[in-house]
Amino acid sequence: LDPNTRPNTKFNKDGVCFACENFNKEIKYYDEIDKQIVLDKLIKKHCLKNKNSFDCIIGVSGGKDSTRQALWVRDKLHLNPLLVCCTYPPEQITKNGADNLSNLINLGFDVLVTGPSPITWKKLLKESFVQGNYLRAPELALYSSLPQIAIRYNIELVFWGESPAISWNDTKTLRNEPYDGNALRNSSTLKNCDLNWMNGIIDNEYKKIPYRYPTEKEFTENTIQIIFLG
């Protein structure tokens, strides 16, 4: 059940949300071969330029879904991925979470774990709550980590799991192609990635770096392409 008070939601004349509409279309018209052809073209465009780098980045939590994605990209697509996990140890990581990441490492993956300062995190989490969206700061750090690292490592292709538009009706993240994730900055939580709300809470600009989502210009200059696998 999705209320119409949720930001960026969209319903048709029958009261069905965009995510449910899309689900019904996928069930009816799903074509795995078609999707594979599109994916192969994107891989050829973004992954075959620099053999001294990883082919792509995959955002992982270490859970069952991201483990499956990592194995699928490596073993089915035959790519060499760098796995990236944004976390907040020790207070936000469970033993199961640590074991899951260890499992990915034991499966032979290169895994990069990044975590912003816990002190900064707590201040921003509180301010996010006061301003009415307690997930804003954590999701800024989470979603910023992948394209930031992609730019630093000269990697063009970034794989995420599910599309916010197709999975939970955040339609402002939608672009012309359903797999295209380059409009994530428009999600209801990220709100175009403006950091001015942190002023007065975080005084040192360098402390904001983990929360700075790369600009559209940076995406274009570095040919960054986010793809939803979900």
Language model segments and positions:
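Hydrophobic positions on the alpha1 helix immediately C-terminal to the Walker A/P-loop
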Residues: 68-69
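Short, glycine-rich nucleotide/cofactor-binding loops
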Residues: 56-65
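Nucleotide-activated chemistry modules centered on ATP-dependent adenylation/adenylyltransferase
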Residues: 1-57, 72-230
